[in-house]
Amino acid sequence: MPFRSAAAALALALVTLLSGCAGPVQQPVNLAADYFSSNKAKTGRIGVVMSELPKPDTQFPGAGCLLCLAVANGAHSAMSKEVQAFSTDELKPLPAALVDALKKQGLDAVLISEPLKVADLPDLGAADPTNKARKNFGALKTKHGLDRLLVVHITNLGVWRSYSAYVPTDVPKAVLYGSVQLVDLGTHALEWYLPLALSRAADGAWDEPPKFPGLSNAYYQVLETGMDMVKKPLSK
């Protein structure tokens, strides 16, 4: 079954909400076509970091009341147990792969191996947040001697199933939510911003306890597709 994404505005709003960012929704910022041939890109030093990865879990958006949520959780207890055992190891090589891609473009790229705790960073508090990072990355600029920072921020992983109160309205879907941003650390302007809002249903039946192989396969395909989306603009 092909990937299904929500309407663009809804996806962007959801990514922003999940990232804990107040204010206007940040729209995508495409990487400039001549970015890798520009003098600015060639002379600066760019760090690559990934946020702490969330633990895969289930969510039931739309099951708004406490009793609704209890019913949804009870009906999917076996599925939730399996989803919580899903791995995130497949994502961990991504930052190093991005460093390699940037080096092949002739950039001075360095890997920041320690996972970034985005929530612990101070807010930037820009008067006009349009196309600006929401967090202040100044400490990383100083610590690592950086001019720019590429941040992979994954906010949610797992399986979600939409509800209307007590009633499911769709099949469960594997999800990956987050964003990628390339930040000019001199101004905190976004040189690239890619929201990630991916979902995929199982191919065929999903309700196959105890291992739920259809949903498991969908989850790992979502991870693969998300990584490809991030790497592709850096490999042109």
Feature-to-residue mapping (PLM):
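Bacterial N-terminal signal peptides that target proteins for export
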Residues: 1-10
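Bacterial N-terminal signal peptides
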Residues: 9-19
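C-terminal/domain-edge helix-coil "capping" segments
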Residues: 21-58, 106, 144, 156-159, ...
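A structural "domain/chain start" motif
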Residues: 22-119, 123, 234-236
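Extracytoplasmic/secreted envelope proteins and their assembly/folding machinery
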Residues: 91, 95-99, 134-138, 223-227, ...
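Short capping loops/turns at secondary-structure boundaries
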Residues: 91, 130, 169-171
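Short, solvent-exposed, polar/charged sequence segments at loop or secondary-structure edges
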Residues: 101-151, 160
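Outer-membrane beta-barrel translocator domains and adjoining extracellular loop/strand segments
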Residues: 163-168
